[in-house]
């Protein structure tokens, strides 16, 4: 098939590579403009652009697409059979939806209709799901509401973070998109409506999502920490300074304490949760300091017996 591929981050790269390997004609790659990134704020090309250029593919990086007449004319001249959209980061306008015969096909990193939105991987982990997957779907004018084409699923190991899950779902989704295109061409894939009664949302993450609410259960706090890696992570306040909890573990203790209260025992640091359970902090970072193991932190900081996190 003649394709236009729209994608930006590393998550989209395996799908682009799989389409090329399957022999599809990727006539154009559309990606977001180069942006400053990292501590030095160096202007970097998106991973999809780097992959496309290495493969000798033409690349465009429009700032806007909805009313971009030059971009529209370019796509109309290509007349693609399908437009593939994987983590592109832009809402696809109606004129693009109407252009190709097979439509605009999206790889979404959840088992739709669950976790529609910008952060499906993070929210699936944060909500304690034990199974997730990838869905190919035909994009419509709603938010991840289009007809589903194919799905594949995988287990989420109990200690896995969203950051670790990202590349696994990217690799799972790549052959799924290739299979979807083959099925559409052969007439063996039947679009399926989503069950609105089963739909849940996975909205874009904010800094506040990472703030630890100690009234939650130990499992909830732990799952949110796993889900919100690498950003916004899990953080709280200690002595008026931001304390980032880089690594934590489920823990068992016999004693009880008010939510947020800390206990230090044998060089280990624990805090109480809303259900009476405990979590252990293994690695942390106090505002203005470097990231460190808890053992190093406790060597240089003495916590009073009634220390409470969150203040």
UniProtKB/Swiss-Prot annotation:
Pfam families: Formyl_trans_C (PF02911), Formyl_trans_N (PF00551). InterPro entries: Fmt, Formyl_trans_C, Formyl_transf_N, Formyl_transf_N_sf, Formyl_transferase-like_C_sf, Met-tRNA-FMT_C, Met-tRNA-FMT_N. GO terms for molecular function: methionyl-tRNA formyltransferase activity. Its EC number is 2.1.2.9. It catalyses: L-methionyl-tRNA(fMet) + (6R)-10-formyltetrahydrofolate = N-formyl-L-methionyl-tRNA(fMet) + (6S)-5,6,7,8-tetrahydrofolate + H(+). (6S)-5,6,7,8-tetrahydrofolate binds at residues 110-113. SUPFAM superfamilies: FMT C-terminal domain-like, Formyltransferase. Keywords: Protein biosynthesis, Transferase. CDD domains: FMT_core_Met-tRNA-FMT_N, Met_tRNA_FMT_C. One of its GO terms (cellular component) is cytosol. Belongs to the Fmt family. Attaches a formyl group to the free amino group of methionyl-tRNA(fMet). The formyl group appears to play a dual role in the initiator identity of N-formylmethionyl-tRNA by promoting its recognition by IF2 and preventing the misappropriation of this tRNA by the elongation apparatus. This is Methionyl-tRNA formyltransferase. The gene is fmt.
């Amino acid at each position: 098939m003649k394709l236009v591929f729209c994608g930006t981050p590393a998550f989209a790269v395996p799908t682009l590579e799989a389409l090329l390997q399957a022999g599809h004609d990727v006539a154009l790659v559309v990606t977001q403009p180069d942006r400053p990134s990292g501590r030095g704020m160096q202007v970097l090309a998106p991973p999809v652009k780097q992959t496309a250029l290495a493969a000798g593919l033409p690349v465009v990086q429009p700032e806007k697409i909805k009313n971009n007449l030059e971009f529209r004319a370019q796509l109309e001249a290509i007349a693609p059979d399908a437009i593939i959209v994987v983590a592109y980061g832009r809402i696809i306008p109606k004129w693009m939806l109407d252009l190709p015969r097979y439509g605009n096909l999206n790889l979404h990193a959840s088992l739709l209709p669950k976790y529609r939105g910008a952060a499906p991987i993070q929210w699936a982990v944060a909500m304690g799901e034990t199974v997730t997957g990838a869905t190919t779907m035909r994009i419509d004018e709603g938010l991840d509401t289009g007809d589903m084409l194919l799905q594949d699923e995988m287990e989420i190991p109990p200690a896995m973070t969203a950051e670790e899950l990202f590349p696994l779902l990217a690799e799972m989704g790549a052959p799924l998109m290739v299979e979807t295109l083959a099925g559409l061409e052969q007439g063996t894939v039947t679009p399926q409506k989503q069950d609105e009664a089963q739909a849940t949302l996975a909205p874009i993450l904010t800094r506040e999502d990472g703030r630890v609410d100690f009234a939650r259960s130990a499992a909830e706090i732990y799952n949110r920490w796993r889900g919100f890696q690498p950003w916004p992570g899990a953080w709280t306040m200690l002595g008026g300074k931001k304390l980032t909890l880089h690594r934590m573990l489920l823990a068992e203790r016999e004693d009880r304490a008010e939510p947020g209260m800390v206990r230090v025992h044998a060089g280990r640091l624990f805090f109480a949760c809303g259900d009476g359970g405990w979590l252990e902090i293994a690695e942390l970072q106090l505002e203005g300091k470097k990231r460190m193991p808890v053992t190093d932190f406790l060597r240089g900081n003495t916590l009073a017996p009634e220390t409470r996190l969150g203040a």
